[in-house]
Amino acid sequence: VPENTVNPPPAIATRIEREQAGVGTARERDDDRDDFSHGFDWPVHGRISGQYGSQRIYNGTPKSWHSGMDVAAPKGTPVHAPAGGIVIFANPDLYLTGGTVLIDHGQGVSSNFLHMSRIDVKVGDRVEQGQVIGLVGATGRATGPHMHWGMNWLTVRVDPQLLVTPASEQPAIEAK
C-alpha cells in the first residue's frame, strides 16, 4: 500500500483524527428500534480475506488489530444491508477507509462497510435487509477489492461472523 497510508505525515494524521471523530460521533446514536433482532445476512459473498482480531501488517509495519472481517469480491459487486436500519454515516472519501457507510440497527448496534467504490445511500435513509447500499471497491488503505464489514455495539467491536450463518451455508443474495 502507499507509504503515506502506513505512516501518514502530520497533516494527513490530523485529517484521519477528524474523520475518525466523525465516525465515532455517528456511532453514539442509541434508540429503541430493534432492526438487529431480525437477524443478519452476509452483505457480500466471497472468500474471507481478513479475519476479525488478526494483526494487520502493511509494508512490513505492524498496525492495529483488524476490527472487522474482509470479504474479497470483484470491484463493482453489490454490497447489501445485512439487516434493516438507518444510515448514520456515508462518505465516499475517508483517507484510510475510502467509501464508508454506517448503518444503525437500533439500540446501539451498528454495521460499517469500508473501501466501497460507490455509495448508493445517504445519511437518514431507511434501508431494508438485503437492499443494495453500494459497491465493493479498493478505496482508502486497501490491498485490493474487498468489502470490510465491521460491527459495533456502541463503542464495543463485535465479530460479524458471530451474527451470521457460516459463509459456506449462505444462500445466494438477491437484491431488494
Give the residues covered by each predicted segment.
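Non-catalytic extracellular/periplasmic "stalk"
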Residues: 1-52
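Catalytic cores of peptidoglycan-degrading enzymes
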Residues: 41-176
